[in-house]
């Protein structure tokens, strides 16, 4: 079992005009956090070039890890990494980890993991990813996933060279019948400035209010492979998402500029979000950031529903 140290950077509470509150920030000695999920009061974090799935308790303390790969390097080389970017909980309480698909065959992979028994199975997604190119996705770069009633939503991140974010809707167990499962896509967010592109990086679903929570980051890259200079990060909130599954395009109902909440978000490339609690008026969120230097950060925040 491998454990990873957590370095506490700061813990504070401030209020701001947009009714969001940053509660806590911690730095993780874990490479390239790209996805986070919350289940049974534990956090499960994947890194796009990490050998292990990291497990934290409810206070962000490392308590376990699940080995997926056995490279000697702390960070798997870019040319062969699986680029696991998305994580979600399936309807039968399994963790589904999904590779980006941006470099075949290495990144056309998924893992299905039982968080209780730690049983894990690897899944090839070649057939499913080949089909996605028939649905108008020019450059494949799967960055997030979440389960909604009756479906799974994936997000494909665009770039300055391919400025299109797309939500992909498919069946709950899409990997079991990849040649035949239904697929539909929704162009999400409008690109109005050619000098910057806001790329979707993660998804979470608030089931009580039927909201899709989307993490978005800006990065100066013109393709689906390379990293670039890190810009600002945002949360997009899309209301009534289950009633919009057949839409062809949609824009967020609410945009939250994270750097405007607190300067601790400056220079942080937010990669993913999970929901720990939802009340009538508030969403309790935890986000992770990958800073492209082999370290990661985790943020706890509250945002008011609007």
Predicted regions and their residues:
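Sequence/structural signature of beta-propeller domains
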Residues: 17-306
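Bacterial Sec-dependent N-terminal signal peptides
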Residues: 1-23
């Amino acid at each position: 079992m491998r454990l990873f140290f957590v370095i506490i950077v700061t813990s504070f509470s401030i209020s701001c005009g947009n009714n969001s509150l940053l509660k806590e920030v911690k730095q993780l000695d874990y490479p390239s956090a790209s996805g986070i999920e919350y289940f049974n009061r534990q956090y499960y974090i994947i890194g796009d070039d990490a050998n292990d799935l990291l497990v934290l308790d409810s206070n962000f303390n490392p308590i376990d890890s699940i080995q997926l790969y056995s490279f000697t390097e702390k960070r798997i080389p870019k040319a062969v990494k699986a680029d696991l970017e998305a994580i979600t909980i399936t309807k039968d309480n399994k963790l589904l980890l999904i590779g980006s698909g941006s470099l075949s065959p290495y990144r056309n992979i998924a893992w299905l993991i039982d968080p209780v028994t730690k049983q894990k199975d690897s899944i090839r997604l070649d057939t499913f990813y080949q089909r996605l190119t028939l649905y108008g996705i020019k450059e494949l770069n799967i960055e997030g996933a979440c389960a909604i009633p009756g479906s799974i939503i994936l997000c494909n991140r665009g770039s300055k060279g391919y400025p299109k974010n797309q939500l992909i809707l498919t069946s709950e167990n899409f990997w079991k019948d990849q040649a035949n499962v239904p697929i539909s896509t929704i162009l999400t967010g409008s690109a109005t400035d050619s000098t910057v592109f806001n790329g979707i990086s993660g998804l979470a679903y608030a089931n009580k209010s039927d909201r899709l929570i989307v993490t978005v980051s800006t990065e100066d890259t013109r393709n689906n492979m390379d990293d670039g200079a890190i810009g600002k990060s945002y949360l997009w909130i899309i209301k009534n998402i289950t009633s919009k599954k057949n839409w062809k395009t949609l824009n967020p109902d609410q945009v939250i500029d994270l750097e405007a909440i607190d300067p601790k978000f400056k220079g942080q490339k937010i990669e993913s979000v999970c929901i720990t609690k939802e009340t009538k008026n508030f969403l309790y969120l935890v986000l992770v950031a990958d800073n492209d230097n082999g370290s990661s950060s985790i943020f706890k925040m509250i945002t008011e529903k609007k």
